[in-house]
Amino acid sequence: MNSIELFSGTGGLALGLQQAGFDHKALFEWDKASCENIKENIANGYPGVRDWKVYQTDVRTVNYNGYTGSIQLVAGGPPCQPFSLGGKHQAYNDKRDMFPEAVRAVRETQPEAFIFENVKGLLRKSFSSYFNYILLQLQHPEIVKKENMTWEEHMSLLEKHHTAGHDDGLSYNVVFRLLNAADYGVPQSRHRVIIVGFRSDSNISWSFPNATHSQESLLYSKWVTGDYWQEHNMKKPSEMPLSTAQLRSVRRAVEETDTPLQRWQTVRDAIGDLPNPADEHGVGAYYNHEFRDGARIYAGHSGSKMDEPSKTIKAGAHGVPGGENMVVLDDGSVRYYTVRESARIQTFPDDYIFSASWTESMRQIGNAVPVKLAKAVGDSVITQMKGLVKHNG
């Protein structure tokens, strides 16, 4: 299954989709440092990446017609700053909104499916009309906004076409869902909107993959069986943080189901085997695992606990990652995650390297889609697509 990816960043989404079985024919990204990082991994011969073609370019200048008919999937994460909870919430007034370019790529390549990722701020009530507008454009990509149209006028045109039930031309069946990466084995609480569409003439029936991990299973492992502490050669804490009612609820959730889920992964699961970066002995065996001084707790930014999923890894403002990119150690002290630790929490493989400075690498990692989350969605999509090929074959 051939694919192209827009706004590829440092390659998190691309890696996950490649692991699911998609063959990327082109990755388009404007940011020079992100492109250079992917290219370094290509040069190092990283499996599955070595054949990628990465183009540092403004997607607004890309002509996709050469991919029409040969691409089964278009994927990408249109820049999220217009919708970010940490941004100024400009959305349709923000020139950084690249969803129109995602729609154009779909229109020109006519893929069997697409996968787009964005921040949960996209679902803010203040953006609800514009989000519906995005979905309508993806459903009917050939209904193009004319130069003198406002987005509201274009939306009215799309609504009329949609409600008329026209089945001619290129159209997609589109669904979206807010997913927590922790529910798919990522050691991090990270909520992202995933939009998936299948070409209407494919007649594919699909839904988002079920969660594979749960908070209840983690609590059960800690406070019912104690398995979590045994796995980490730790003594079970004497203080029970759950009430009797909460503990009963956890038991029911785990014991009274036919399909028990795996437990959420924690920071300790992800980085517990790495040497202390402040101790240079043994650190050299791990690339990108250098200590960074200066971490401190301040209001609203207290760092991530070792025995919980990490807080959301963030790109940071003005090149300075926030308290979310710190870890609270067992002695109560805090320090910044190393680049390698952050990469692990985003489920990048250890041999996928980040060659820029700490600040730049943390920015790239913070902007990435967790590899495991991308793979979970990609696995589900490609399974349905292969089933269609088998049925039609």
Which role does the model predict for each range below?
Residues H24-K25:
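Short beta-strand element of Class I
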